[in-house]
C-alpha cells in the first residue's frame, strides 16, 4: 500500500497539467493564476517552478517524483478508501501524463527559444541598420570618389596637377612623350599653347622632362669633349676635299702607269738603237716598235699624205738624206723629234763636235717639230710623262757620236750610207706615217674612257 500512496499526485499539480495540455487560449493565464495561488498558500516547499525546468527535462522529471512523494505523505482519507482499480487507472494516467510531460517539455523548450531568437534578431537588426546607415554610407561615397580618382590616376587619364579629367576647348589634356603624364594646358607651367596641342608633328615634353634631358645632354657632352679631337681627326680626312680627290689621283697614276707601259717599250727600243752602230738597226728597231703601237688602233689613210708632206718638205729644204731618219723617228716618238733630228743631222755631216752641225739647219728643225707636235703634243701633255725625253736624246746623241766616229773619214761616205738607208726606210716611213697618229688617237680615247669610268666609280663610293 505504501507504493500506491507514493504514486498518488497532488490535485493542484494535476490541474496545472490540465491547463498545460489544454489548447484553449486562456490556459496560459489560468496556469499562471494557479501558480500564484499555490505560492500564496505557502506551498513553496512543495512546488517551486524554476527556469531550468524548461531547459532540462530530466530535472523536471526528477522534481516531479519528490513532489508526488511530498503530496502523498500528507494524510488523506480519500486515498485510503479508493479501491485498487482506481489506483490502476491512476497509474495508467500517470504513465500517459509522464509521456505527455516529455512531449510538452520538448514543446516548451521550443516555444521559449523562438521568442528569444526573435528578440535577439529584433535587438541586433537595428544595430546593423544603424551601422549601414551611419558608418558605411559616407565612407562609401568618399571611397567611390577617391577610388575613381585613384583609378583615373593609375590609368593615366587625369591631370597630374589638378587630378581631374575635365576637358574643354583651350584646356585640353596633353601627354608628355617622355614620362607619359597628362597635363591640362592651364595647369602646366609654362602654359601649353593651342598650337602645340593641335600640331600632330610636335613631340611635346613637360618642363620636368625637358630639364632632365638637358642635364643628361650636358653630362654626356662633358666626357665626350676629351676624346673629341681624336674622333674629329679620324673623321676629318673623310670629310675633306683631298679624300674626294684621292681616287682621281689614283686613277691618274694608274693611267700614267698604263702609258708608262707603252713608253717603256719605246725606251727599250731607243736603248736598242743606241747599242746598234748602224742606221739599218735603227730602222729595224723603229719598225718593230711601230708594229706594237699599230696593234691598238685602226688604220686611217688620212695620215699618209701628212707623212709624205713631211718627207717632201725635208728633202726640199735640206736636200740631205738624214731628214728621212729624223722624220721616221718623229713618226715613232713624236715628243722626241727635236733632239733626234739634230743628232742624226750630226751623223750625216760627219762632224766630231755636237754644236756646229745644228747651226746650218734651224728652219728645218723648227718646221719638223711644229708639224710633229701638232699631231702628238696633246698626247704628251695629257700623259704628263716628260721623263723619256732626256734619256732618249742622250741615247740618240751617243748613237750619233758612234756614227760620227765610224764615218768621220769623209762626208760622201755618210751621205751614201744615208742614201742607202733612205731606200730601206721609205716603206717603213709610209707605214709609220699611216699608223702612228691612229694608234695615239686610240690610246687617247681609251685613256679618256678609263678616266671617266674611274671618276664614276669614285663618285659612287663617295655617295655610299
From Swiss-Prot:
Residues 69-84, 227-239, 339-371, 384-421 have a biased composition (Low complexity). It comes from Xenopus laevis. GO terms for molecular function: zinc ion binding. Belongs to the Integrator subunit 12 family. The lineage of its organism: Eukaryota, Metazoa, Chordata, Craniata, Vertebrata. Component of the Integrator complex, composed of core subunits INTS1, INTS2, INTS3, INTS4, INTS5, INTS6, INTS7, INTS8, INTS9/RC74, INTS10, INTS11/CPSF3L, INTS12, INTS13, INTS14 and INTS15. The core complex associates with protein phosphatase 2A subunits PPP2CA and PPP2R1A, to form the Integrator-PP2A (INTAC) complex. A zinc finger (PHD-type) spans 156-212. Gene3D superfamilies: Zinc/RING finger domain, C3HC4 (zinc finger) (3.30.40.10). This is Integrator complex subunit 12.
